[in-house]
Every structure is written in structure tokens, then in C-alpha cells.
Amino acid sequence: MKIEGKVSEHESINMMYERVSKEGVTNIVDRFNAQEKGRCPFCEKGLSCQLCSMGPCRISKDKPTGACGIDAAGMVVRNFTHKNMLGTEAYTYHAIEAAKTLKATAEGKTIYEIKDVEKLKWFAKLLGIEGEDVNELAAKVADFVISDLSSLEKSRLVEIFAPEKRKELWEKLGIFPSGVFQELLTMGSSAMTNVDSNYVSLAKKSMSMSIATCMAAQIALETIQDILFGTPMPHESHSDLGILDPEYVNIAVNGHEPFVGIALIKLAEREEIQEKARKAGAKGLRIIGFIETGQEILQRVDSPVFAGIVGNWIVQEYALATGCVDVFAADMNCTLPSLPEYQRYGVKIVPVSRLVRLKGIDEGLDYEPEKAEEIAMKLIDMAIENFKQRDKSKAVKVEQKKKIVVGFSPEAILKALNGDLNVLLDAIKKGDIKGVVALVSCTTLKNGPHDSSTVTIAKELIKRDILVLSMGCGNAALQVAGLTSMEAVELAGEKLKAVCKALNIPPVLSFGTCTDTGRAAYLVRLIADALGVDVPQLPVAVTAPEYMEQKATIDAVFAVAYGLTTHVSPVPPITGSEDAVKLFTEDVEKLTGGKVVVEEDPLKAAELLEKVIEEKRKALGI
């Protein structure tokens, strides 16, 4: 597919694309279109392998195996597991960084503090950790998490957070995981040349790894971030490029980890920092949220120094092209290799993770918990100096800006229900809320203009009285589209509209990042436990209408293992094998209760998800 005409669902991006394109600057849309005729049809189906020196091999009807003898199903699923491993590795890296930060904070070595003491005590109690001293508890929790993620035995975190019926099933299927590091070792060693070529075996190992990823690494890291930075609670903020004001010193925080961003906010809230910015000629200094780092902060922080979120990963080039950003602090995930080119717009690109390096940018201010304040101060000094040099007359002040409501963690949802989950359950039983769909998605150009499919499917779902929980880059898409605002209530079906007005909530609940998949699974567990049913029986489904990268694939595998019907688009690279397609879309449902549904038309996808939910309701007799 080639993107022509409107490149994005959002007018701000369409406008900035026109500017960048006219100036002849490399950008994601033009690069995507340039690749249209060069894409390998074998790769798109998962039928190309480059693992060993005997290849590359491509499978076709007249050449049904690779040189080693692997068939289409084995090749397709093995290729898919490689993507899944990368997603697991990134989530696990983040979890270890969170645990290290918690321990260093407990030892008094960071700029942070234990912000949610009750969450710490709750988590420690679940882990079987006792003690009265807050810092001692925090240190023990950090040690527990690091140990469990490395465990050779069954994961204690999975034991604690997974539903009983799921644990029994996973044991029966042989996919109950050990620590996530061990799962990575098993998966990686299996997916080498001439080791495991059985597509069912590879898929089961991927499921085991996905459970360790989402029910251990993800839940642990988000809980730790709640402990350190506060559990998300509903509050208003802003989205879209209009949050960028060229008259301010603007520091963008980009990636998936909130650590440096939170340190920047803590410093920016000091009057002497704001005064320093004003002396440089600025109105003040602001922190600007980009993609998941911005989303992590957005869910937790309500501060005048945090301007909000510009959008998801496809937005970053166009946001920098406004000429409003002074420093772009890049942590793990989703920093485009093209960004050094965008320094022509007056921004300084600074990696703040050892994972991130770019062409011509060989060094960074790599995050270490003990150095967070020092790193943040250096970034602020860089930004203020950059502001003095930046040509404000060339900056573009974008008008589009949305007021949004964010911060709907499980605790926040319970609070909105006055602490009584039965309010939600009764609404579902009566049909006022037909069901719930978790929208956990990236953004891509592969299936149409930027964010178009995501916005369309969300609008269709709420119109059908289906409540949406939004996570990931898809969450930012819906924020910029205004669907996480109270104004969006008018777009909902009559029954859902009444519920939203009664509870004072939007029809799309801004739940967090892709890392909140585990947190969403825990909320689903609470609902299943309250109803006394297993997860697959619930009128709940998942959609990833614009999945893009490796974190998304491991999240999807987990959703299926958890027992949820999971819609994905664009078409994943598994279609080269009928056996593999049948495994993911049919056979697995007989084992876990979950399955993959592939549909690129967002309207048809919404219809399919509604049908799934109605079938679940009928089976429950509601």
C-alpha cells in the first residue's frame, strides 16, 4: 500500500508533512512509499530465512523446504518467535531498570522517593515480604523481582498474579513459565538453525515466554513505577502538536522508560530552574511527552511544567520539524534513525540510554539511577543554551491541541466505580456496557494513513456500546483524536453514553502504555474472579489495529495464551503456511480459549469483535 493524499488521521501531522516534504527532508511517509516496490513477497509471508550460511532460503510450492529441510510452518513460526524474543528482551530490560531504580531509591541514592507507600506494602505482602521500614521493604521487593525474573524455577510473580484457572491450564499445556530470562534462553536456543523445527513446539515456547513477559516482567515494572512515581489517577492533560510553544525552553522525552523524564520534571518544578530559563529569554521551561515515555509520565503527572503528549512514534519527525524543541532525550525504543537529520530544525538529539545510538551520535547521557539528577540537570543546561541559539522566527506554532482525560489504572477504575466492581459487572450484565475491548496497539502506515484504522475501530466500538481501554501508541492516537475526552461521550451508543455520564468517564479509558498489557490482564482477572468464570468466558477481547514492532507481537501471543480473541492488523508474516495460520486462528482456541483474528478493514474488525462479545454474553446467559 502506498500512502497518498491524507497521510494521517490528524490535521496537525498532515500540515507538518506538507512542510517537511516541500523542504525535501527525509520523513517516514516518503521513505515508506519509496519502499513499496522493493518489498519481498516471501518475507511478507514469513517464507524467507537468513539464519545460516546455506541461505538465504525462500520456500515456494516447487521448493517446499529450506536447504536444511525445514518446512513452511517451521520457518514461518520460527521467524515469528525471533520477533517475539526481541519484544520480551525490551520489556525485561525495562523491568530490571525499574527494579534497580527502586533499590537505589531505597538506599537514598536517587532523586526519587517512594511516592505510593500503600502500593509498596500491597505488593510486598503479595510477594510474602514482611517489614515496617519503607526503604527496607522497597529494597527487598527490588531484590525479589530481579531474582524472580532470573529464576530457574516456576515464576513466583506469575503464580501470584495469574488467575487460578489459567495457571491450571498452563500447567496442563506445559507452558507455565520459569523466570523470563530462562524462557528467553530456552526460546533463543530452540530457534537456532537445526534445533526446534516443529511449529507447534515453537509456538508453545513462545506462549510460555509471553506469559513470563506480561504476568511477571510487565506487572512488576509497572507496579514499581507506581511505587516510585505514583499510581495513575484520572486528571486532565493535553495532546497534539499544539502543546509545543516556541517561546518556551522545550525538552522532549522519547522512548518507553519514564526515569529521566520524571527527574526532569522534578527539577523543572524548582523555581530557580524556571528563573534560569526566563533569564535566557524564554517564558519558562517545559517537558514535552513523546510516545511511551510521554505516556508513562502523562498517566501519573499533573504538573504545569509537563505540557502533555504530542502523539505516537510516527509523529516524532513532524514534531521536531516545528522548530520548537531544544533537546530530544531518547531512551529505549522508537527513536527513528533519521532524527540526526532533524537537528537542522534547531534540536539537539541526546541519547539517555545505553541502548540508543544514532548515526553521528556516538555518545549519550546514559541513565543510571544514581545519576538521574545529574543527567537531568545537564539536559536542562543544554536546552537553555540551545534556546538562546534557536531561531524562534522559523518555528511553527501548531494550533491543534486537545484536552484529554488520562490515568485510568485498575485502582482508578475501581475508584470511579466508588470502590465497587459490581457497578461495572451490573452494567455488563444489563447490557449497558456490551463488553470491553483492550486496544493495545502501535501505529503503522502499512494498512492506511497514520492512526486511521485505530481511530475508526475505536469509534465503531464505542458506538456499539463497547467500552475501550486504550494502551500503547494506539492510546496516543485516540488522545489526539479526542476520544479520551468527555466530549467523546456523545459518540458512544446510547447505553454506554448513559454509563459514562453517570460515572463521569470517557468511553475510551486511557489506560497507559503497551507495558500496561500485564496490568490490563490483572484487571481482567479481577473481573473473572468476581464472576467466578475463566477468562475466555468473559465478553472481553483485544485489538491491535496498527501493530508495528516486536513488543506488539509478544503482547498478542500473551493475549491468546490468556484466552482472549485478539484482532490484529496489518496481516502478520505468517500467511506462508496454512498450518501456521490454522494454528493461530483456529487450533489454539481449543487449547487456550483465545485466538487471532486478522482483518484489515477496521469497520469489519469492529463487527467481528462485537460478534465475539455477543457470543460470550449469550454463553453466559446475559
Curated annotation (Swiss-Prot):
It comes from the Archaea. Binds 3 [4Fe-4S] clusters per homodimer. GO terms for molecular function: 4 iron, 4 sulfur cluster binding; anaerobic carbon-monoxide dehydrogenase activity; hydroxylamine reductase activity; nickel cation binding; peroxidase activity. It is an enzyme of class 1 (oxidoreductase). Pfam families: Prismane (PF03063). [4Fe-4S] cluster 1 binds at residue 40. Its cofactor is [4Fe-4S] cluster; [Ni-4Fe-5S] cluster. GO terms for biological process: generation of precursor metabolites and energy; response to hydrogen peroxide. Its EC number is 1.2.7.4. Keywords: 4Fe-4S, Iron, Iron-sulfur, Metal-binding, Nickel, Oxidoreductase. [4Fe-4S] cluster 2 binds at residues 49, 52, 57, 68. [Ni-4Fe-5S] cluster binds at residues 256, 334, 442, 473, 514. It catalyses: CO + 2 oxidized [2Fe-2S]-[ferredoxin] + H2O = 2 reduced [2Fe-2S]-[ferredoxin] + CO2 + 2 H(+). InterPro entries: CO_DH_a-bundle (IPR016101), CODH (IPR010047), HCP/CODH (IPR004137), Prismane-like_a/b-sand (IPR016099), Prismane-like_sf (IPR011254). Belongs to the Ni-containing carbon monoxide dehydrogenase family. Cluster B is an all-cysteinyl-liganded 4Fe-4S cluster; cluster C is a mixed Ni-Fe-S cluster which is the active site of CO oxidation. Cluster D is also an all-cysteinyl-liganded 4Fe-4S cluster that bridges the two subunits of the CODH dimer. CODH oxidizes carbon monoxide coupled, via CooF, to the reduction of a hydrogen cation by a hydrogenase (possibly CooH). Homodimer. This is Carbon monoxide dehydrogenase. It comes from Archaeoglobus fulgidus (strain ATCC 49558 / DSM 4304 / JCM 9628 / NBRC 100126 / VC-16).
